Protein backbone atom coordinates (compact mmCIF):
# COMPACT_ATOMS: atom_id res chain seq x y z
CA UNK A 1 0.00 0.00 0.00
CA UNK A 2 2.89 2.37 0.73
CA UNK A 3 4.16 1.99 -2.83
CA UNK A 4 0.66 2.63 -4.17
CA UNK A 5 0.38 5.86 -2.17
CA UNK A 6 3.48 7.20 -3.89
CA UNK A 7 2.64 6.32 -7.46
CA UNK A 8 0.33 7.99 -10.00
CA UNK A 9 -2.54 5.59 -9.25
CA UNK A 10 -3.31 4.47 -5.70
CA UNK A 11 -3.74 0.73 -5.52
CA UNK A 12 -2.51 -1.96 -3.20
CA UNK A 13 0.61 -3.86 -4.21
CA UNK A 14 1.22 -6.63 -1.78
CA UNK A 15 1.41 -10.08 -3.29
CA UNK A 16 2.19 -12.24 -6.27
CA UNK A 17 -0.92 -14.31 -5.52
CA UNK A 18 -3.72 -12.79 -7.60
CA UNK A 19 -6.59 -14.26 -5.55
CA UNK A 20 -5.38 -12.95 -2.19
CA UNK A 21 -7.53 -10.08 -0.91
CA UNK A 22 -5.68 -6.83 -0.25
CA UNK A 23 -8.43 -4.42 0.77
CA UNK A 24 -7.60 -2.39 3.90
CA UNK A 25 -10.68 -3.55 5.81
CA UNK A 26 -9.81 -7.27 5.67
CA UNK A 27 -6.81 -6.88 7.98
CA UNK A 28 -6.66 -6.58 11.76
CA UNK A 29 -7.74 -3.27 13.31
CA UNK A 30 -4.10 -2.30 13.89
CA UNK A 31 -3.10 -2.91 10.27
CA UNK A 32 -6.32 -1.37 8.92
CA UNK A 33 -5.58 1.81 10.91
CA UNK A 34 -2.08 1.94 9.42
CA UNK A 35 -3.47 1.47 5.91
CA UNK A 36 -6.02 4.22 6.50
CA UNK A 37 -3.15 6.48 7.54
CA UNK A 38 -1.33 5.73 4.30
CA UNK A 39 -4.47 6.52 2.29
CA UNK A 40 -4.95 9.76 4.25
CA UNK A 41 -1.36 10.72 3.49
CA UNK A 42 -2.10 10.17 -0.19
CA UNK A 43 -5.15 12.46 0.01
CA UNK A 44 -3.07 15.08 1.83
CA UNK A 45 -0.59 15.02 -1.04
CA UNK A 46 -3.17 15.46 -3.82
CA UNK A 47 -2.26 19.13 -4.49
CA UNK A 48 1.40 18.11 -4.94
CA UNK A 49 0.44 15.12 -7.09
CA UNK A 50 -1.81 17.27 -9.30
CA UNK A 51 0.94 19.87 -9.66
CA UNK A 52 3.51 17.24 -10.65
CA UNK A 53 1.01 15.47 -12.95
CA UNK A 54 0.44 18.74 -14.78
CA UNK A 55 4.18 19.21 -15.10
CA UNK A 56 4.46 15.65 -16.44
CA UNK A 57 1.82 16.48 -19.04
CA UNK A 58 3.67 19.63 -20.09
CA UNK A 59 7.21 18.20 -20.11
CA UNK A 60 6.69 14.52 -20.87
CA UNK A 61 8.77 13.63 -17.80
CA UNK A 62 7.05 10.97 -15.72
CA UNK A 63 5.66 11.68 -12.26
CA UNK A 64 7.52 8.57 -11.03
CA UNK A 65 10.97 8.28 -12.47
CA UNK A 66 14.18 6.39 -11.78
CA UNK A 67 16.88 8.21 -9.86
CA UNK A 68 19.21 8.32 -12.85
CA UNK A 69 16.82 10.67 -14.68
CA UNK A 70 17.61 13.36 -12.12
CA UNK A 71 21.16 12.24 -11.25
CA UNK A 72 22.60 10.68 -14.45
CA UNK A 73 26.25 11.29 -13.51
CA UNK A 74 26.03 9.53 -10.13
CA UNK A 75 26.62 5.76 -9.97
CA UNK A 76 24.33 5.30 -6.94
CA UNK A 77 21.42 6.52 -9.06
CA UNK A 78 21.81 3.29 -11.04
CA UNK A 79 22.72 1.06 -8.09
CA UNK A 80 19.67 1.85 -5.92
CA UNK A 81 17.06 0.66 -8.39
CA UNK A 82 14.15 0.52 -5.95
CA UNK A 83 14.40 4.22 -5.15
CA UNK A 84 12.62 6.74 -7.33
CA UNK A 85 11.64 10.37 -7.54
CA UNK A 86 7.96 11.14 -7.06
CA UNK A 87 7.75 14.49 -8.77
CA UNK A 88 10.59 16.95 -8.41
CA UNK A 89 10.93 17.11 -4.63
CA UNK A 90 9.97 13.76 -3.10
CA UNK A 91 12.24 10.72 -3.15
CA UNK A 92 10.79 7.33 -2.22
CA UNK A 93 12.93 4.44 -0.97
CA UNK A 94 10.36 1.62 -0.63
CA UNK A 95 10.67 -0.85 2.22
CA UNK A 96 11.10 -4.23 0.53
CA UNK A 97 12.65 -6.30 3.33
CA UNK A 98 10.71 -8.34 5.88
CA UNK A 99 10.20 -6.77 9.29
CA UNK A 100 12.25 -7.91 12.28
CA UNK A 101 11.29 -6.87 15.81
CA UNK A 102 8.72 -4.41 14.44
CA UNK A 103 11.05 -2.63 12.00
CA UNK A 104 12.28 -3.05 8.46
CA UNK A 105 15.76 -2.06 7.34
CA UNK A 106 16.08 0.23 4.32
CA UNK A 107 19.38 1.20 2.73
CA UNK A 108 18.88 4.67 1.31
CA UNK A 109 21.08 6.64 -1.05
CA UNK A 110 20.60 10.36 -0.55
CA UNK A 111 21.78 12.52 -3.47
CA UNK A 112 23.90 15.61 -2.74
CA UNK A 113 22.23 18.33 -0.70
CA UNK A 114 20.04 18.21 2.37
CA UNK A 115 16.97 16.00 2.68
CA UNK A 116 14.18 15.77 5.24
CA UNK A 117 13.13 12.32 6.31
CA UNK A 118 9.34 12.47 6.35
CA UNK A 119 8.87 9.81 9.05
CA UNK A 120 11.23 11.36 11.60
CA UNK A 121 11.41 15.01 10.52
CA UNK A 122 15.21 14.78 10.68
CA UNK A 123 17.45 16.74 8.33
CA UNK A 124 19.93 14.40 6.66
CA UNK A 125 22.99 15.30 4.65
CA UNK A 126 23.01 13.89 1.13
CA UNK A 127 25.89 12.39 -0.81
CA UNK A 128 25.84 9.22 1.27
CA UNK A 129 24.20 5.85 1.80
CA UNK A 130 22.38 5.39 5.10
CA UNK A 131 20.79 2.42 6.80
CA UNK A 132 17.43 3.46 8.26
CA UNK A 133 14.79 1.51 10.19
CA UNK A 134 11.06 1.99 9.78
CA UNK A 135 7.98 0.72 11.60
CA UNK A 136 4.98 -0.42 9.59
CA UNK A 137 3.29 2.97 9.96
CA UNK A 138 6.32 4.96 8.74
CA UNK A 139 7.11 5.77 5.13
CA UNK A 140 10.68 5.87 3.80
CA UNK A 141 10.27 9.10 1.85
CA UNK A 142 12.58 12.09 1.71
CA UNK A 143 11.88 15.71 0.81
CA UNK A 144 14.48 17.95 -0.82
CA UNK A 145 15.52 20.82 1.41
CA UNK A 146 13.95 24.06 0.22
CA UNK A 147 11.02 22.31 -1.46
CA UNK A 148 7.52 23.68 -1.03
CA UNK A 149 4.95 20.88 -1.11
CA UNK A 150 1.36 22.00 -1.61
CA UNK A 151 -0.71 19.72 0.63
CA UNK A 152 -4.11 19.39 2.24
CA UNK A 153 -4.37 19.03 5.99
CA UNK A 154 -5.80 15.98 7.77
CA UNK A 155 -9.32 17.43 7.77
CA UNK A 156 -9.86 16.74 4.06
CA UNK A 157 -12.11 13.69 3.86
CA UNK A 158 -12.57 13.54 0.10
CA UNK A 159 -11.87 15.57 -3.00
CA UNK A 160 -15.48 16.45 -3.83
CA UNK A 161 -15.94 18.86 -0.93
CA UNK A 162 -18.54 16.79 0.93
CA UNK A 163 -18.02 16.04 4.59
CA UNK A 164 -18.17 12.28 4.28
CA UNK A 165 -15.59 10.02 5.83
CA UNK A 166 -14.13 7.85 3.09
CA UNK A 167 -11.54 5.93 5.05
Language model region names:
Residues 160-167:
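Short, intrinsically disordered, charge-balanced linker/junction segments flanking boundaries
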Residues 1-147, 152, 160:
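Catalytic-domain carbohydrate-binding cleft regions of carbohydrate-active enzymes
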Amino acid sequence: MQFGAFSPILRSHSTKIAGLTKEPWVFSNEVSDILRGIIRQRYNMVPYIYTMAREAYETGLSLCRPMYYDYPETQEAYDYRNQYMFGNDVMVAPATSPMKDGYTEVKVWLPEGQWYEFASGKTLQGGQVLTRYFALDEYPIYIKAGAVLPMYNDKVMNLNGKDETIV
